[in-house]
Amino acid sequence: MTTKTKSWSSAPLPFQGQKRNFASAYREVLKLYQECTTIVDLFGGSGLLARISKDERPDARVIFNDFDNFADRVRNIPNTNRLLHALREVVAGLKRHSLIPKEKKEAIISILEKETGFVDFVSISSSLLFSMKYETSLEGLKKQTFYNNVRLNDYSPADGYLDGIEVVKGDSKEIFERFKNEKNVLGSLTLRI
């Protein structure tokens, strides 16, 4: 008996510029390029187009340009969830979406400063900043006003999200150059290479 893998329509973590709004349209476009044996997600981001490509075309070689280190963020979901638990304790009793008082902000910063491993500041900042604002570092986060937007639930494990996908990291122009002369290659956003 084969196990059905999850079909992704959105990335497992927040990402500015996520392409989830046209996931179904992208699936339809992929059907038009059945002759393409290699699909390159040049602009990477959350890897959603690469994931959809592999789900729709399991026979194809799919390459994801992880320029934004999304794979590291996915691998660290358990750590992010652990930090979110700590943040929930700090903001307990505060009204949702309200301004976080200075002493609570300092407690949150103290928690983050004590972290010695990888911290997904994009996911953490999405729980602390005004809607659709993100920071990528502790220094950037410290400068912001905090709001109690802390997630009420953990992020779901993203097991298998990048399975079967070749992860590379580089300038999209360099990756384009690497594949432009190969036959049957489809670049992200259906730009035929």
Language model feature labels by segment:
Residues 35-37, 59, 182-184:
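A general structural motif
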